[in-house]
Amino acid sequence: KKINNRFVYWKGQLGQFDAWENAKLIMQDLSASPQEKKAATQFYRSIRERKKIIDFAENKIDAFKDLVLANPDKRILAFGGANEFTDMLSDSVIPLAQSYHSKRTKKQKKAALELFRDGTINVLCSTKALNQGFDVPDANMGIICGITSKSLSMIQRVGRLIRFQKGKTGEVIVLYVRDSQEEKWIKNAVKNLKNVTFEI
């Protein structure tokens, strides 16, 4: 119980992300007692399991599919929280989409980009592979299905849709689980965005 209180204290004083990081440190600490390591491992696993449930929420796939089918003229970049979920998003709207992430071969990724750029598909689904140094001038809608505690990735995703073209606007839709950690993250993330109008 004493050890569990230690994690509750960390969570309250440092924030959940820091408590999670401290749990990882204890698991690696050679001087930590077996009880401390066990509690840290349980805490770490529970956070990961909760995140997986949120990341793979089936309602996100249903909402994503509805959005894609309701916007046939849009050029859409979609972002999932994990490679497997990104593939599930892409598979839900085949043949309109292809996935692009680190588990794909260079040949597969190149083919997906070419299909998107030449208009064969109008949806490109990614995880983090498109976050930095990548631009898709024709994209005009973003659907974000995976939220993280870091706002930078969201800023990069939004910026990719609207930058470099004067007068161009991008529409970004964020699918998140209500009353979850995702809702807190999205609200914190949008505070850091400038020249972007958001409705939550």
Question: Where in this protein do the model-derived segments appear?
Answer:
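A general structural motif
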Residues: 73-75, 169
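Conserved segment of the helicase C-terminal RecA-like domain
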Residues: 160-192
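A short beta-strand element within the Helicase C-terminal
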Residues: 123-125, 132-148, 153-156, 163, ...
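Interdomain helical connector at the RecA1-RecA2 junction of SF1/SF2 helicase-like NTPases
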Residues: 1-71
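Long, largely alpha-helical accessory region at the distal end of helicase-like NTP-driven motors
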Residues: 198-200
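Cofactor-binding loop segments of dinucleotide-utilizing enzymes, especially the Rossmann-like FAD-
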Residues: 81, 102, 147, 175-177
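Conserved helicase ATPase core of P-loop NTP-dependent helicases/translocases
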Residues: 75-80, 84-134, 153-155
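Helical mechanochemical/support elements of P-loop NTPase systems and associated helical scaffolds
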Residues: 60, 85, 108, 150-154, ...
